[in-house]
Each structure stands twice: as C-alpha cells, then as structure tokens.
C-alpha cells in the first residue's frame, strides 16, 4: 500500500531558483519529446522512442537539473499516450503551458539521494530545504518519491510518497451499513436521516472573490500590482480549497470509524455539473473528492465502500413498501407513498441505497 504526505517547504531564494529551473526543464523535455513524437509519426508513421538523455548534447543546460525529474517527465508523457490509446475520449496529450498556475516536478529515491529529517528535506542537486512536518512518519514507511510543487499563491509544497508494506489490512465482515445520497444542499444525506451540513465555502466567499477579481481586471497586465492582486485572488481560492478539504477529511474519518460498509451511488458528477446546469453547486460540494477520501480511509480500516449502479431508481422507490413511482419531479422534495410513508426524498433515497448496497455485499460475500 502506498501513502502520500503533503508538507509545506520553505526554500530560500537560491533554492526557489533551482526549483523553478527544474520545473522549467521538466516542462521543456515533456513538450519537446511530444513535438518530436508528433513530427516523427507524421513522416514515418511510427512511434519515436526518444529519451531525455538524447537531448542533453543539444541542450547542455539540462545537465544542471535532477536527471530523475526529466525521466519522470518522460514517464508522464508515456502514461498520457497509454491513456489516450486505451480511452480516446480522454484526448490526445497536450503541451504543458508555462503560464499554468500550478507547476511541479517529481524525483525518486535512489542510493540515498533524498533525506527526510524532522525540520529539513534534502533533494538531489539542492542544499537542505527547511520544512514543516505536521505529523510523525512511522519508522517502517519507506520513502519512494517526492513531488515538489508551487501553488498559485506562491507557496511551495512537497508530496512524499511512502511504501507501507505492513499496512495492508484484511477485509472484515460488515455489520453496520450506511447509505449516502448526493444532495445539492449540504453535500450529502445519510440513511440515518442526518445531513452532512457542508457549509458551502465557495458560495460564502463568492462576494469577496468577485471583489478581488474585479480589482485584478483593473490592473495593468504583468505589472507589479497585477502580480500582487493575482496572488490575493489565488489565496482566496486556496483558503476555500483548504476549508473544503478539512471538512471532508474530518467527516470521512468519522464515517470510516463508525461504519463497516458505506453504500454510495456511482454518479457521473462531471455530467451532472455540465448537463443539469449545476456546475457551481457540484464543484463547491467536492462530492467526488469526498468519496475518494472516504474510500481509502475505509480501505485502511479493512472496511467496504460499496458502489450502487447510477441507474438504480433510489429516489422513486418507497423505502418502506418497495413501491416504485412512475414519475417524480426534481422539484418534489418530499416522498409521499400510497402506503402512508412520507419522508424527505433524499433520506428515502439514502435508505434505498443502503439496502441495495447490503444486497450487493451479500452477493459478493
């Protein structure tokens, strides 16, 4: 099992220059290799097998940065091509832009070239960087790779990937089940009748964000004031992102500890965001990110995340008698059945998802 820990790093001026240089060289290699592959295929109708080493003679400044960062750029390009050939809908690999807000590079542990201490991190071709380690790393975790990134706000982070050989937990029998139904207000509803109560951080910060973006639009592009204001806008977005992640981490941890199996619908969130004109609501919820967090936390505990088919009529079926309605408008917020059952439609759907999840679990057991 692999585990990642993201930490804040505090590079000095010289180290920031080295990080930016490595990011730039990694981007250059990716784009150059992609351009050469396209050009070669157009002429020869074959895939070019090029490597970063073949470019160092023509571009000697590539030797100044970590060679493993360039090798990882090659791996990322090859991965993009494999994904395209496997799923053409993903799109053909695209060039990486220098103006992209978030830039990063990845390097690997090889013969002790990376050292992690309580207050410092040693990276290849760089002096030790001051860090803030917010959690104790278990002694049996083995460091595999480090991804150094710069956020739009100008902050630098390092994502440490560890191999945890002794962390694999056997699946335990499930007794306590929970059903979760997606909801526009509050992110989701539980089969217990409770709501997640997500505070809609983006909606709350929308006025302030609009004000800061309006100020940015009045600045002269690429001026010093423009860069300062751009950073303020980025800090607003970063705060919203951090608030959302903090809420979701705490909620997913609580559910993973309380229940043996959590049942959810396998929704097409991207389609809902665009097709139903629910873009801001779906994206502010971050429901997909929440399910990802919940999934790996349940796996760590040896518990189960059960996905119910998205076409299962969870909203139309009565959770008491099983009667299925032919029509149910999106505006109908209460589920009223002929049997006398009257409850919130989202709670009714969550109960149905839980029962369908139980059925799937018993079939697979």
Language model: regions and residue ranges:
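Nucleic-acid substrate recognition interfaces
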Residues: 1-365
């Amino acid at each position: 099992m692999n585990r990642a820990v993201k930490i804040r790093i505090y590079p000095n001026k010289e180290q920031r220059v080295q990080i930016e240089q490595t990011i730039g060289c990694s981007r250059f290699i990716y784009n150059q290799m992609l351009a050469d592959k396209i050009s070669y295929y157009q002429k020869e109708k074959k895939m070019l097998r090029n490597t970063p080493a073949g470019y160092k003679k023509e571009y000697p400044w590539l030797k100044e940065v970590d060679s493993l960062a360039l090798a990882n750029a090659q791996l990322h390009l090859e991965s993009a091509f494999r994904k395209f050939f496997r799923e053409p809908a993903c799109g053909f690999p695209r060039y990486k832009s220098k103006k992209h807000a978030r830039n990063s590079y990845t390097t690997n542990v090889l013969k002790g070239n990376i050292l992690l201490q309580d207050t410092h991190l040693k990276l290849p071709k760089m002096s030790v960087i001051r860090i803030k380690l917010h959690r104790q790393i278990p002694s049996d975790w083995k460091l595999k790779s480090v991804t150094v990134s710069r956020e739009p706000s100008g902050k630098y982070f390092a994502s440490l990937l560890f191999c945890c050989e002794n962390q694999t937990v056997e699946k335990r029998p499930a007794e306590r089940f929970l059903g979760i139904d997606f909801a526009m207000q509050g992110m989701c509803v539980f089969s217990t009748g409770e709501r997640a109560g997500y505070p809609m951080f983006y909606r709350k910060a929308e006025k302030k964000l609009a004000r800061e973006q309006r100020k940015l639009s009045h600045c002269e592009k690429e001026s010093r004031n423009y860069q300062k204001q751009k950073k303020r806008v980025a800090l607003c977005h970063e705060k919203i992102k951090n608030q959302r992640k903090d809420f979701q981490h705490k909620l997913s941890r609580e559910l993973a500890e309380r229940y043996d199996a959590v049942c959810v619908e396998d929704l097409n969130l991207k389609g809902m965001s665009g097709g139903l004109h629910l873009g801001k609501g779906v994206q502010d919820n971050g429901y997909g990110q929440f399910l990802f967090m919940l999934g790996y936390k349940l796996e760590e505990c040896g518990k189960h995340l059960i996905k119910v088919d998205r076409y299962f009529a969870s909203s139309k079926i009565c959770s008491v008698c099983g009667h299925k309605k032919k029509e149910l408008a999106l505006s109908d917020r209460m589920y009223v059945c002929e049997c006398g059952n009257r409850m919130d439609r989202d709670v009714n759907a969550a109960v149905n998802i839980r029962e369908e999840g139980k059925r799937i679990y018993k079939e697979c057991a």
